[in-house]
Curated annotation (Swiss-Prot):
Gene from which the chain derives: rpmB
A Gene Ontology molecular function term of the record: structural constituent of ribosome
Keyword Membrane annotated: no
UniProt name for this protein: Large ribosomal subunit protein bL28
Keywords assigned by UniProt, alphabetized: Ribonucleoprotein, Ribosomal protein
GO biological process: translation
GO cellular component: cytosolic large ribosomal subunit
Cited Pfam families: Ribosomal_L28
Superkingdom, natural source: Bacteria
Family: Belongs to the bacterial ribosomal protein bL28 family.
């Protein structure tokens, strides 16, 4: 299981832990990942993702899970999220047309 957000592609960063005497030792800054179940209103189904808490705020800000996926870049999404995005686009196109 990778330590990468499936919606925003946040990944671990590398830096230094600096002591009072300025001795630097390598450390990793890990993203705050949580397992969340999102409900797609368009598909009428629920989907589980491992996302950062930053992504949770972004989903709320953009008006829900479906709206977030439709506005998100494919380069940031996981393959599972891209497939879901395509399904939502097809369903909305069929509904509109």
């Amino acid at each position: 299981m990778s330590r990468r957000c499936e919606l925003t592609a946040k990944a671990p960063l590398v830096g230094h832990k600096v002591s009072h005497s300025n001795i630097k030792t390598k450390r990793r800054f890990l993203p705050n990942l949580v397992n969340v179940t999102f409900v797609s209103e368009t598909l009428s189904s629920s989907v589980r993702f491992r996302v950062s808490t930053h992504a949770l705020r972004s989903v709320d800000h953009r008006g829900g899970f479906d709206a977030f996926l439709l506005k998100a870049r494919d380069s940031e999404l996981s393959p599972k999220a891209i497939e879901l995005k395509r399904q939502i686009q097809k369903k909305q196109a069929a509904k509109a047309g």
